[in-house]
Design a protein with these regions (language model features):
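Flexible coil/loop and intrinsically disordered segments
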Residues: 1-155
Length: 155
């Protein structure tokens, strides 16, 4: 909850649950993303539900290990800085899924601390996630894999 602060108006619309859905949808299916986020999420729900049955512990561990890693290594969590009160969806998706992919590729990363994540506050990454960043398939893939590769390089 601390990593994804949301105003009460968004909480009442169940946006926290949507962030969890976005995490799993992009983690397992980001390369299939086309253009419409809502359509992508809707199509991903069925895939996630099928995978969730019998795998609850593993899926929960992926989420928790990713969030713990972000909490330890990103000075502002998913936020751009500590003065911002909410987390942008695009930033959240890129960082959460990119970190999870890196952890899946190298599970030893999950327990690392003091990983250099300064790149998350530099122009190259910020331009990938700015408010007018497109949700085109190449851009979604590029920002998720950028985070994954930066985490793998830094560990």
């Amino acid at each position: 909850v601390d990593l994804t602060p949301l105003p009460s108006s968004k909480l009442s619309r169940r946006e926290r649950e949507e962030y969890v859905l976005r995490f799993y949808a992009y983690l397992y299916n980001y390369q299939s993303f086309v253009k419409s986020v809502q359509k992508f999420l809707k199509e991903s729900i069925e895939l996630i539900e099928n995978d969730f049955t019998g795998n609850e512990a593993r899926l929960r561990e992926i989420l928790f290990s990713t969030f713990n890693f972000v909490n330890r290594n990103f000075k502002s969590g998913f936020k751009r800085n500590n003065t911002v009160s909410i987390v942008s969806r695009v930033r959240y998706e890129a960082i959460s899924v990119g970190c999870a992919l890196a952890i899946q590729q190298n599970p030893l990363i999950a327990d690392k601390t003091n990983v250099n994540t300064n790149w998350a506050f530099e122009d190259e990454f910020l331009s990938m996630i700015r408010s007018d960043a497109s949700n085109s398939k190449p851009k979604v893939i590029a920002r998720i894999e950028y985070v994954r590769d930066k985490i793998l390089e830094a560990t």
